[in-house]
Regions:
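Nucleotide-state-sensitive switch-loop elements of NTP-binding domains
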Residues: 2-11, 18, 22-142
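C-terminal accessory "lid"/substrate-recognition subdomains
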Residues: 2-3, 151, 155-158, 167-200
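Conserved N-terminal glycine/acidic-rich loop preference
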Residues: 8-18, 22-24, 56-57, 156-159, ...
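Residue-level signal for inorganic ion chemistry
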Residues: 42, 101, 156, 162, ...
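Short, ordered loop/turn segments at secondary-structure junctions
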Residues: 43, 164, 193
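Non-catalytic interfacial helical region
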Residues: 110-117, 125, 136-149, 153, ...
Length: 200
């Protein structure tokens, strides 16, 4: 029996109001991201344009861009297996990567644990990394007040610093210093108006 080529999974976490939903919405609309499945909490929060919708199937929406948007039904393991089964039986278009959006200040550890501890999921999927979006305006305050934000930063391979265009450069440098104290190896990318501006 041929071994299934594992599908990479990227977890996207982010502080509340950091621009995570805006980023995901942008990903869904771009042709170059076709064959990407995005798992979100509810369709309403992503602001899907009905003109871009090809067809729907229960908790799954297929877009003209070739992306698949799916809401979590029950638990993550069930949702991931269901997505794969529907792809294999031709009920949805094929996808070659998955992005999972976490809610607000959710701890990404349970998602990582689910992906790495379930034999059923390990056969199909591989964890390809964690991306954390940090709001440059309120990032320092969030780190001070929310323990989960520290976990999000600590586990990330990439950290996207949003709203840097409306924050003083010294404030941004100070926040980057704090982020590097928590996670010295993550790549830090600044974003302005939704575009990648520079890398630290």
């Amino acid at each position: 029996m041929n071994q299934i080529k594992q599908i990479p999974v990227i977890i996207i976490t982010g502080f509340l109001g950091s621009g995570k939903t805006t980023l995901l919405s942008s990903i869904l609309k771009k042709k170059e991201n076709q064959k990407t499945a995005v798992i979100i909490n509810e369709f309403g929060e992503i602001g899907l344009d009905h003109a871009l919708i090809e067809h729907t199937d229960e908790n799954i929406v297929e877009l003209q861009s070739g992306c698949i948007c799916c809401t979590i039904q029950g638990d993550l393991k069930k949702t991931l297996i269901d997505l794969f089964d529907k792809m294999m039986t031709g009920r949805i278009s094929s996808f070659n990567r998955i992005l999972i959006e976490t809610t607000g200040l959710a701890n990404p550890v349970p998602i990582i644990h689910t992906l790495m501890s379930s034999i059923d999921l390990i056969r199909i999927y591989s964890l390809d990394g964690v991306i954390t979006i940090v709001d440059a305006v309120n990032g320092g305050k969030t780190i001070d007040l929310q323990e989960e934000s520290i976990k999000q930063i600590a586990l990330a391979e990439k950290i996207i610093l949003s709203k840097t265009d409306i924050v003083d450069k010294d404030e941004t440098k100070s926040l980057i210093y704090r982020i590097k104290e928590i996670n010295p190896v993550a790549q830090i990318i600044s974003i302005s108006f939704g575009n990648i501006k520079n890398k630290e």
